[in-house]
Regions:
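Short helix-adjacent coil turns
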Residues: 16, 23-24
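Amphipathic alpha-helical repeat scaffolds
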Residues: 10, 17-18
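Outer-membrane beta-barrel domain signature
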Residues: 93-95
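Generic short beta-strand segments
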Residues: 84-91
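Short beta-strand edge/turn micro-motifs at domain boundaries
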Residues: 81, 100-125
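Generic structural detector for well-ordered beta-strands
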Residues: 72-74, 89, 107-109
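A solvent-exposed, acidic/Ser-Thr-rich amphipathic alpha-helical stretch
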Residues: 3-7, 25-75, 85, 98-99
Length: 125
């Protein structure tokens, strides 16, 4: 594991957060594996395509995501993981706008020459 491997993994996480706010479908589709799942704080396990669709249609509207901390970055072979903590301003599934201290446990895998997010679990911190 090199420092540049760790930096590349962190940059994917940061790109995802930017893409959520910017509603950048192309970036999300590029960095999220087709089989990616997002486990929400409610326990709901959401498939990649449904999550992207809800970002695009505004059911999940992200206004901002301010990074506070990224830690436990591990790269081993073709797998990687990290924990990110961001203050996320969003309105979700018809609720009002709130700011959450959102922690994401992110797992990534190198496939076909590129590293993609394969699973994520959300909680608060």
């Amino acid at each position: 594991m090199t420092r540049s491997d760790e930096e590349a993994v962190v940059e994917i996480y940061r790109a995802e957060n930017r893409a959520m706010v910017e509603r950048d479908q192309a970036t999300l589709e590029r960095i999220l594996a087709e089989t990616m799942t997002l486990t929400h704080m409610t326990g709901y396990v959401q498939p990649r395509q449904e999550w992207i669709a809800q970002i695009m249609d505004g059911k999940m509207k992200y206004y901002s995501s301010t990074e506070e901390r990224v830690f436990d970055v591990v790269v081993e072979g073709d797998q990687a993981s990290l924990v990110g903590q961001n203050r996320v301003k969003a309105s979700v599934w018809g609720g009002g706008v709130s700011i959450w201290p959102l922690q994401m446990r992110v797992n990534l895998k190198r496939q076909a020459g590129r590293c993609q997010i394969v699973s994520q679990v959300a909680s608060t911190y």
